[in-house]
Curated annotation (Swiss-Prot):
Cellular component annotations (GO), alphabetically ordered: chloroplast
Subcellular location: Plastid, Chloroplast
Single Gene Ontology MF annotation: RNA binding
Pfam families to which the protein is assigned, alphabetical: Intron_maturas2, MatK_N
Sequence intervals crossing the membrane: none
Family the UniProt entry places it in: Belongs to the intron maturase 2 family. MatK subfamily.
Major subcellular site: plastid
Name of this chain's protein: Maturase K
Keywords assigned: Chloroplast, mRNA processing, Plastid, RNA-binding, tRNA processing
Coiled-coil region(s): none
HAMAP family, A to Z: MatK
Cited function: Usually encoded in the trnK tRNA gene intron. Probably assists in splicing its own and other chloroplast group II introns.
Amino acid sequence: MEELQRYLEIDRSRQQHFLYPLLFQEYIYVLAHDHGLNGSILYESMENLGYDNKSSSLIIKRLIIRMHQQNHLMISVNHSNQNRFLGYNKNFDYQMISEGFAVIVEIPFSLQLVSSLEEKEIAKFHNLRSIHSILPFLEDKFSHLNYVSDILIPYPTHLEILVQTLHRWIQDAPSLHLLRFFLHEYTNWNSFITPKKSIYLFTKDFTKENQRLFLFLYNSHVYECESVFIFLRKQSSYLGSKYSGAFIERTHFYGKMEYLVVVLRNDFQKTLWLFKDPFMHYVRYQGKAILASKGAHLLMKKWKYHLVNFWQCHFYLWYQPDRIHINQLSNHSFYFLGYLSSVLLNLSAVRSQMLENSFLINTAIKKFDTIVPIIPLIGALAKAKFCNISGHPISKPVRVDSSDSDIIDRFGRICRNLSHYHSGSSKKQSLYRIKYILRFSCARTLARKHKSTVRTFLKRLGSELLEEFLTEKEQVISLIFAINSSPSHRSYRERIWYLDILCINDLANHE
């Protein structure tokens, strides 16, 4: 770690040109696999190959020696088991190097993130990483908007596009050549095994074996796809700065402001006229994005046309226009982050009296509403073998050596995680049914293990089994409920967003 820290203190421009030598440092692989390789994909691969944890450092050294030998870095002509990629085991060596390579190329981006946070004086930046931080933003902004577009960001179909994307950020030519070699070799190997499935790089096998590298490449690709929003927003803000003067160093820019506005107007007048909208909001999670606006339907159609042409011309991606859906927020619900969100119109009547005359005033208040869709969630539970397709709880096959406490803790942890993630739902009826399914699935699993009945286990465990399926907040509310039922009932219906959720629950991710 000390060696890596010294390297990080080098000037940023020099780092981008000298990333490749880090690939031959042992501490990079130790850092990539959590200081000892325990619990990582690499450690599991070693167990499958018959290695133990003590020899992991020796394996890395042998791999680095083979990397120095150029004859092992040549693309194999015939894909056979005897002539494998980078040595004796292609998959094992590829995982090791891809994990280390992902750590190395993340260095310039990490430095930019740290410097940006320091300039903006953001101390608790981990709160910004939370998925639930998006939902309060939607709750605050979307109630004032009119139209929303569901956008599915396309995957890159050509390997060279990914390499050229990184070339704009990293000037280290050997690292880019190595990345190009990795991607082509992987697709060539897959085309030999499964010829019909070699068109796309981001397959399930690639994402599972090279998760860190996949996330880095995919995030880089998505950032480039989103560059059109950043570009148009900046140009639009430049035009508005003629009257507001929103420059940091105003004394140096006042003289050039008029000329700058004239140039931008001449070059981008038509484009900005199409897309300038002060009430445009954009959010994204993984490959799905939401674009909402207060403008008219025509403006959203122009954005759709521009995005399709931009992705096709700039990234050579054939994107189907029907993958972007434009709907009105007042009569349409959109699915995002495991929630079915919509804008409800609450009507209320207020009686006003002035002297002898009374008036009845009707008011309409827009409210952003989020609910949990029960049918997709039950489908996810059925896929995980907790229930059947109709939502009836079933028993899960477990290992004989699993104790009753381990089984109860596992089911309870899944239930608490789902309740924790869906705490922002305005209606808790769906969560009640999910808890019922998981609780009785746990009871059926225990009854199956001991060859008994469900009623017997429910009588024996009683409240102990119920407590495992309650979150900490529900346990506190259950204590308050005995004192005063009305306030606790209201608090139980409140929506709560947690800033400690960094990833979506697997059972909730059924998009």
